[in-house]
A protein has these predicted regions:
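Short acidic/histidine-rich motifs immediately flanking catalytic phosphotransfer sites
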Residues: 46-53, 72-74, 201-204, 228-231
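Short glycine-/small-residue-rich Rossmann-like dinucleotide-binding loops
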Residues: 59, 203, 209-211, 237-238, ...
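Phosphate/diphosphate ligand-binding glycine-rich loop within oxidoreductases
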Residues: 49-129, 142-143, 148
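Rossmann-like dinucleotide/phosphate-binding beta-alpha-beta segment
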Residues: 23, 139-229
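N-terminal glycine-/charge-rich "phosphate-binding" loop or analogous flexible N-terminal tail
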Residues: 1-58, 325-328
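Oxidoreductase and adenylate-handling cofactor-binding alpha/beta cores
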Residues: 111-130, 148, 164-171, 300-313
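Rossmann-like dinucleotide-binding domain for NAD(H)/NADP(H)
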Residues: 99, 221, 230-328
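Structural alpha-helical scaffold elements that stabilize or flank donor/cofactor-binding regions
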Residues: 24, 44-47, 67-70, 197-198, ...
Length: 328
């Protein structure tokens, strides 16, 4: 029997027209939705209700227990990317839905973007570009990275790559891992420290943890207050790691010098969101990993994960398939 495979959220188009599209279509009856709407529960269920396999392209489609309950034939969610915060993993385990992802594929691209945001916000590049185009000639002092302290919250694939890219700038590295360090900090030239020490001593704090029940809102008002008023925050991980109102207040009141943000609580950022009015923030639309190299490699990996699952040899497993159940 040919499995029904649905891509509910290929907007903006990533899979369509890529090198991964033909291999995916060879695996079953494939339906690709190239328009918005997957962020709405009823529409998501309409799209994937009869699916055996879902390939999740965008994190705004949320696979809750209620959604899974409406998809009785679903056997696999293959995620393009590493984040799983849009998937109820416990519900997947309970309902026998396997989950895979593509670890490490976007690590270099997101690490590059992290460094770019550090430079953009510390050097005030967007503001100076805007002022120069307007006929001004801004001459204010800038920050340089050499001699600064960079604190990394998380040393997964992206955090480690950021450390490697940052070292040639002459930056001192601190790191806090979510769990035992096991020598990971030393391996990238960083000093492992408690989070309180990292926040107090860092000139730049960069977030690289996954979003979970434990890390939701981790940088709250009390922890943000530990940072220097001259410090910068960079977030290319997940918006939910930071208490939004506390961050806005700190930036607005000068208790933080600035921030570079690629991720937000609500995506796309709604009109009127106070972060849009902050002059000391550099914003990008959660596209730090959106390079052609990442798209091609990540989508091919996600499709390969579907193929391996269908032949009973799953890889990159986040939630394992139930024993004894046929893949499709």
């Amino acid at each position: 029997m040919t499995p029904k495979i649905v891509v509910p959220d290929d907007y903006p188009p990533a899979l369509t027209g890529s090198a991964a599209e033909a291999p995916l279509r060879a695996l079953g009856d494939v339906q690709v939705h190239g328009e918005r709407g997957a962020e709405q529960e009823a529409e998501l269920v309409r799209r994937i209700g009869a699916a055996v396999v879902v390939v999740n392209i965008r994190a705004y489609a949320r696979f809750t227990d209620r959604v899974l309950a409406a998809c009785p034939g679903l056997r696999l969610i293959s995620i393009w990317g590493t984040g799983t915060d849009n998937v109820d993993l416990d519900a997947c385990r309970a309902r026998g839905v396997a989950v895979t992802n593509t670890p490490g594929v976007n690590a270099h691209a997101v690490a590059e973007h992290t460094i770019a945001l550090m430079l953009a916000v510390t050097r005030r590049i967007p503001a100076m570009d805007r002022d120069t185009r307007a006929g001004q000639w801004p001459r204010g002092l800038l920050e340089q990275l050499e001699g600064k302290t960079l604190g990394l919250l998380g040393l997964g694939a992206i955090g480690r790559r950021v450390a490697e890219l940052a070292r040639p700038f002459g930056i001192r590295l601190l790191a806090t891992t979510h769990g035992p360090d096991n020598g990971r900090a030393a391996a990238v030239g960083a000093r492992a420290v408690p989070v309180e020490t990292l926040l107090r001593e860092s000139d730049i704090v960069s977030l690289h943890w996954r979003l979970s029940a434990e890390t939701q809102g981790y940088l709250n008002r009390a922890r943000l207050a530990l940072m220097k008023p001259t410090a910068f925050l960079v977030n290319t991980a997940r918006g939910g790691l930071v208490d939004r109102s506390a961050l806005i207040e700190a930036l607005r009141e000068g208790r933080l010098a600035g921030a570079g943000l690629d991720v937000f609580h609500d995506e796309p950022v709604p009109a009127g969101d106070p972060v849009l009015a902050l002059p000391n923030v550099v914003l990008t639309p959660h596209n730090g990993g959106m390079t052609r190299e990442v798209i091609d490699a990540g989508l091919l990996r996600a499709v390969e994960n579907v193929e391996r699952f269908l032949r009973g040899a799953p890889r990159d497993v986040v939630v394992a398939p139930p024993r004894g159940r046929a893949p499709a």
